[in-house]
Structures are given as structure tokens and as C-alpha cells.
Amino acid sequence: MNKKADIWISAVIYVALGVVILAVVLAATTPAINKMRDRNTYLQTKEVMHKIDSTIRDVLREGPGAQRTASIEIQRGEFSITTGADNPPTIAPKKITWTGPSKYIASQEGSTITEGNIKISTIKQGSQYQITLTLDYTNALAGLNTDLKTLSGKYNLLIRNEDAGKISIKGI
């Protein structure tokens, strides 16, 4: 009878030891996994921004009436389009911006770097960083019109050259 109890006690100790080891491994790897996930989100969003920029510049180069579609997916963060319509008719900002929290550091904290036409900035906020990717068309476009202000999830965009450097972006 005593031998049977010893076997059960040993089994419980081995299971408890296994659970403790599993918990330690998970606690050690979770921050690294989260940082890699944030890095992948940043890289995918940067690729989306390059795609949108390339499409806008192609449509602009082709002249009035030219249009293209772009499929995008915004997984995390806030993707917004500023048309400058709320500002006086001086030089109003025309920007496409993505901002999101991250454990990944995309650029030196507090400075802005340029990669192609994308401006990348990183600001420390508590234990995380706030990454901002910006496409600034203020000096490149006469107008930027859209029915979309903030995007999240999957979208098909129609980017069209309306006339004389005016671009419209619509969800389809």
C-alpha cells in the first residue's frame, strides 16, 4: 500500500515540476515573441505605406483620369489620411500617417529618419514606444480628397488622379 502512495506522490511532483518549467520558459520567451510581433507589424505597415506611395506617384505621373486600386491591411495602430480640407486654403497639410504602440524601436528615439518617401519617428511612452510612419504630400499634391479618415482592417482603395495634381482616395 505504501508503494502505491509513493508512485502517486512522485507523479504529482513530476507534473508540478513540468508545469513550473513550462511557466518559466513562457515567462522568458513572451517578451521576445511580443517584440518580434511588433517588429513584423511595423515592417508590414511600412510595406503598405510604400505600396500606397508608389500607387499615388504612378497615378500622378500618368495624368488626369488615371486610377489604380490598392489592397491594404492595417493590423494594429491607427492609419489616417489628412486632406487639409479643414484648414484655410494656404498650404494645408496633406498626409497619410500610421501611428501605433510597439516594443520594437524603429528609429532612434526622438529623431525622424527618412526611408524612401516615408518619415519614421519613435517616441518613448512609458514602457513602450510610439512609432509614426508619415507620407507627406503637402508640397507634391495640389489636393488630396478622401471619404476615409481613419482606417483599420482590410480595405480596397481606389486612387484616382482627378486633375492638375489632385488625388482622390476612396474605399471600394
Go through each PLM region and give its residues.
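Membrane-proximal N-terminal amphipathic helix
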Residues: N34-A66
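Short, glycine/small-hydrophobic-rich surface segments
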Residues: V59-I81
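General N-terminal targeting signals
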Residues: V24-L26, H50, E73, I113-E115
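N-terminal single-pass transmembrane signal-anchor helix
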Residues: N2-T29, R37, T41
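Solvent-exposed, charged interface segments at domain starts and junctions
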Residues: K4-V12, A70, D86-T90, K103-I105
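Intrinsically disordered, low-complexity regions enriched in Pro/Ser/Thr/Gly and acidic residues
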Residues: T82-I172
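Short amphipathic alpha-helical surface micro-motifs
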Residues: K51-S54, E73, K149-S152
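A generic structural micro-environment signature
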Residues: I13-V15, R39-Y42, A66, E78-S80, ...
